Curated annotation (Swiss-Prot):
<dbReference type="InterPro" id="IPR000711">
    <property type="entry name" value="ATPase_OSCP/dsu"/>
</dbReference>
<keyword id="KW-0375">Hydrogen ion transport</keyword>
<keyword id="KW-1003">Cell membrane</keyword>
<dbReference type="GO" id="GO:0046933">
    <property type="term" value="F:proton-transporting ATP synthase activity, rotational mechanism"/>
</dbReference>
<dbReference type="InterPro" id="IPR026015">
    <property type="entry name" value="ATP_synth_OSCP/delta_N_sf"/>
</dbReference>
<protein>
    <recommendedName>
        <fullName>ATP synthase subunit delta</fullName>
    </recommendedName>
</protein>
<dbReference type="GO" id="GO:0005886">
    <property type="term" value="C:plasma membrane"/>
</dbReference>
<comment type="function">
    <text>F(1)F(0) ATP synthase produces ATP from ADP in the presence of a proton or sodium gradient. F-type ATPases consist of two structural domains, F(1) containing the extramembraneous catalytic core and F(0) containing the membrane proton channel, linked together by a central stalk and a peripheral stalk. During catalysis, ATP synthesis in the catalytic domain of F(1) is coupled via a rotary mechanism of the central stalk subunits to proton translocation.</text>
</comment>
<keyword id="KW-0066">ATP synthesis</keyword>
<keyword id="KW-0406">Ion transport</keyword>
<comment type="subunit">
    <text>F-type ATPases have 2 components, F(1) - the catalytic core - and F(0) - the membrane proton channel. F(1) has five subunits: alpha(3), beta(3), gamma(1), delta(1), epsilon(1). F(0) has three main subunits: a(1), b(2) and c(10-14). The alpha and beta chains form an alternating ring which encloses part of the gamma chain. F(1) is attached to F(0) by a central stalk formed by the gamma and epsilon chains, while a peripheral stalk is formed by the delta and b chains.</text>
</comment>
<comment type="function">
    <text>This protein is part of the stalk that links CF(0) to CF(1). It either transmits conformational changes from CF(0) to CF(1) or is implicated in proton conduction.</text>
</comment>
<keyword id="KW-0472">Membrane</keyword>
<comment type="similarity">
    <text>Belongs to the ATPase delta chain family.</text>
</comment>
<dbReference type="Pfam" id="PF00213">
    <property type="entry name" value="OSCP"/>
</dbReference>
<dbReference type="GO" id="GO:0045259">
    <property type="term" value="C:proton-transporting ATP synthase complex"/>
</dbReference>
<keyword id="KW-0813">Transport</keyword>
Length: 181
């Protein structure tokens, strides 16, 4: 696991704890979505690499966010930006948002699974995979289907950090690894 992901998870967990304590998860989700969207802008990212002091960088970022959404950013949200700028972590905002969203889905007993296949799956095939995963995870499952011709055949299922690889490409790779050892 990369160190950036670990750091982003730490921020996401801290923000999630505040959101649960304040009973305002949706508000924080929309704030982090805004911060993430703004931080993905090329011009804003170029600010992150300039030699600006953290307070100045935070103020500029917050001003951009306020201008974008046409309303003030609250004090708690500003403090998150100040802390992340102080530690040179503003580039992690999209990852923090993704991890926060994952924590929210766990909190409401819903999990998103990514189903990757070589060809588009039919509705009944997706439903069968979704039902099996919902039973296995004991949660409501939101499937996201993607097509990747490189896997040759079969299905890959991703649930957070867990990967279930039932693809031909994965089997060939594992067979090759066994034969070489």
């Amino acid at each position: 696991m990369s160190s950036m992901l670990v750091v982003a998870r730490t921020y996401a967990q801290a923000i999630f704890d505040i959101a649960v304590e304040q009973k305002n998860i949706n508000k924080w989700k929309s704030v982090l979505d805004l911060f993430s969207e703004i931080s993905l802008n090329r011009l804003v990212q170029s600010l992150f690499f300039r030699c600006l002091e953290p307070k100045r960088l935070s103020d500029i970022f917050i001003a951009i966010c306020e201008d974008y959404q046409k309303k003030q950013v609250d004090t708690f949200s500003k403090n998150i930006i100040y802390i992340m700028a102080e530690n040179n972590r503003l580039l992690l905002l999209p990852i923090v948002f993704k991890e926060f969203t994952y924590l929210c889905s766990i909190y409401v007993h819903t999990v998103e699974i990514e189903i990757i296949s070589a060809w588009p799956l039919k509705y009944n095939q997706l439903k069968k995979i979704t039902d099996i995963m919902a039973k296995r995870l004991s949660k409501t499952v939101n499937p996201v289907h993607k097509v990747d011709k490189d896997i040759l055949a079969g299905v890959i299922i991703r649930i957070g950090d867990t990967v279930i690889d039932g693809s031909i490409r994965g089997r060939i790779f594992r067979l090759n690894h066994v034969l070489q050892s």
